């Protein structure tokens, strides 16, 4: 009986984690739109209230990077959740650069495992491809 319960619990967790992948794939941006790559959090595991550094590589044809958006999904207190509003990230300090690596400090106060999806937008409103990375807050 215990093995069956453990197997069902494992199956449920796998099913919930697979649900994180139901969003559209991180495809290609529109022609002439910005591209991002290599999304990372350093460190990937942080204590609650501590700061982590999000970094990613970007290429923008018109050198007019405006802002980014983080879509937050995750598991916290044994519940799967998804944020209703994307979290805006100010990237105006990188305006004027055609390519480079952006580094943004982020702070999380609530515990849990987060799957964060990032995309950036230019001043003309062109959106980039989307990238995902995992961050654990303990």
Q: Predicted segments — roles?
A:
Residues 128-130:
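Short Trp-Ser/Thr-centered turn/loop motifs at beta-strand boundaries
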Residues 41-46:
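Short beta-strand segments of immunoglobulin-like
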Residues 92-103:
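Aromatic sugar-binding surface patches on proteins
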Residues 9-19:
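Bacterial N-terminal signal peptides
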Residues 51, 65, 111-115:
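Extracellular Ig-like/FN3 beta-sandwich strand-entry sites
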Residues 20-34:
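Bacterial Sec signal peptide processing site at the extreme N-terminus
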Residues 98, 107-112:
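Surface-exposed, short loops/turns at beta-strand junctions within beta-sandwich domains
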Residues 58-62:
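Extracellular acidic, Ser/Thr/Pro-rich low-complexity tracts
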């Amino acid at each position: 009986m215990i093995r069956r319960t453990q197997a069902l619990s494992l199956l449920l967790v796998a099913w919930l984690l697979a649900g994180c992948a139901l969003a559209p794939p991180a495809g290609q941006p529109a022609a002439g739109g910005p591209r991002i790559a290599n999304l990372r959090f350093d460190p990937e595991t942080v204590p609650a209230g501590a700061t982590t550094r999000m970094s990613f590589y970007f290429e923008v044809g018109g050198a007019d990077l405006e802002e980014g958006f983080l879509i937050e999904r995750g598991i916290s207190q044994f519940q799967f959740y998804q944020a209703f509003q994307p979290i805006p990230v100010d990237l105006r300090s990188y305006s004027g650069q055609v390519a480079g690596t952006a580094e943004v400090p982020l702070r999380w106060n609530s515990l849990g495992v987060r799957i964060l999806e990032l995309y950036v937008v230019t001043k003309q409103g062109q959106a980039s491809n989307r990238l995902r990375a995992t961050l654990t807050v303990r």
